[in-house]
Amino acid sequence: DASFDESSLFQRNPEPFKNFPIEEMIVSNVWEKTINCNWKSFWENFNECLHCPNIHPELTDLVPMFTRRIINPADLPGWVPKTDISDPKFSGGLKKGAQTWSEDGSAQDCQIQSLTEEEILKGHVYASSWPSMFIGGYSDHIRIVRVIPSGSEKVTILAEWLFEKKTLENKKYNKDNVIKFAKRVMEQDAHACELNQ
């Protein structure tokens, strides 16, 4: 009997995904990109936000905290929780009025119903299992990105977008709104990784 211990597999625990109906979601789109960099350079780029304001103007507009070059307010030296600050530049989450990682910030009335209001307001959650993959969860979709080294200076990323069936069946929902945004961010990261290599 092999036991499954997710804490030993994930550096960023998948607990934040407990309310996502992952088993019922459908892989709708797949995108592959080969980057001329070492897989360690890819992960180094992924795990720091110092580059965000210079490399990701659209992302830092959507997630104001990233303009401060941090992922979490607790990353700051001397940080103490402040419950009276609602500005997402200081408290985290998406900019006012945004619902998901997309071109216009809209989830197009297709937010995942099993998510709590707090989870939706947070804007995004992550789990990662180095060096193989990371998962991004958003209010209307999930993106799984596999990291596949193919040499000392080459890595392929394979991104898959998962949506609920009812979202894909909704004729008013334009999935390209989220796919185009994520591809832009990944292309920007790929360029930064290659410059760093």
Q: Which residues fall in each region the model found?
A:
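C-terminal catalytic domain of Rieske-type non-heme iron oxygenases
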Residues: 1-197
